[in-house]
Design a protein with these regions (language model features):
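Cleavable N-terminal export/targeting peptides
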Residues: 1-34, 273
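Transmembrane beta-barrel domains of bacterial outer-membrane proteins
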Residues: 30-273
Length: 273
């Protein structure tokens, strides 16, 4: 796929926004987890924070199963008890190809998570229960593909000059799985944001994940995936739109083919303030 083809796809993101909204409405809503906070709160509060996202991303890869990547979901801080917070995450991710029609949903990820944290100085430490299940869309039904992780996560937000940095890192053990050979996971996420004007800012993000593989399940080694992206943030009264480009390597891109894929990407993301 050529660069001009990727640009044409990105130009059609307005049309895709409707598709994302329709697909997301079919499931209980990635924020992949609670976002890092600058400091603990001063008093207990209920429903203190909600991080929402709606995104559509065009993929440049020579595979008709992977043309678009969409997300609809969010993270909610249910209770802030000063020494930490209790949070939940719900996310629906739909992969769209072009095998049978221009926007052809063919698989989906459902992510659910619950966590509780405590502050240790300027660092937040959380215990996490994380569930992922993968499903085919508009395709014959197959066996379940899913895994549950019990792990820990550290979060930190700080500023350098006029740039705000958010850091998250975590690791966990697979407690239960179906049709995957993962035994443990580890991940990190780093995002840097800088305001240029009251309305416009720039940002860059890098994230990665490791999947330990059960030696008894086959001859695969530890799997690695990652994503980098950078773009602009345009602030509105109640929300922010991010326009970005980047590159991704995804482990087991198809749920029944244990092969990684790589692609360039460009897209949009709507988030709340």
């Amino acid at each position: 796929m050529t660069d001009s083809s990727l640009i044409r796809r990105a130009a059609r993101c307005a049309r895709l926004m409707l598709v994302v909204a329709v697909c997301g409405a079919r499931a209980s809503a990635q924020q992949p987890g609670p976002q890092p906070l600058a400091a603990p709160s001063s008093s207990p509060e209920f429903l203190t924070r909600y991080d929402f996202q709606l995104s559509g991303t065009a993929l440049a890869v020579d595979d008709k199963r992977f043309s678009w990547d969409t997300h609809f979901g969010g993270a909610l801080d249910v209770v802030d008890y000063v020494r930490g917070r209790a949070s939940i995450v719900a996310d629906y991710q739909a992969m769209l190809g072009s095998e049978f029609r221009p926007f052809d949903p063919n698989q989906a990820y459902y992510t659910l998570e619950a966590s509780g944290s405590v502050w240790a100085g300027a660092i937040e430490i959380a215990g996490v229960f994380h569930h992922v299940s993968r499903h085919l869309s508009d395709r014959p039904k197959r066996p379940a593909v899913a895994w549950n992780v019990l792990g820990a996560r550290v979060l930190r937000q700080f500023s350098i000059g006029g740039t705000t940095l958010g850091v998250r890192a975590g690791a966990g053990r697979i407690l239960q799985h179906a049709l995957v050979d993962y035994s443990w996971t580890a991940d990190f996420d780093l995002v840097a944001r800088r305001s240029l004007t009251e309305r416009v800012g720039v940002y860059a993000r890098g994230s990665g994940e490791l999947f330990g593989v059960d030696p008894a399940s086959g001859d695969r080694e530890m799997q690695r995936d990652g994503r980098i992206e950078a773009g602009v943030r345009i602030n509105g009264r109640a929300g922010v739109v991010e326009l970005f480009a980047g590159y991704e390597r995804r482990v087991d891109a198809d749920p029944f083919e244990r092969l990684p894929l790589q692609w360039a990407l460009a897209g949009f993301r709507l988030v709340n303030k």
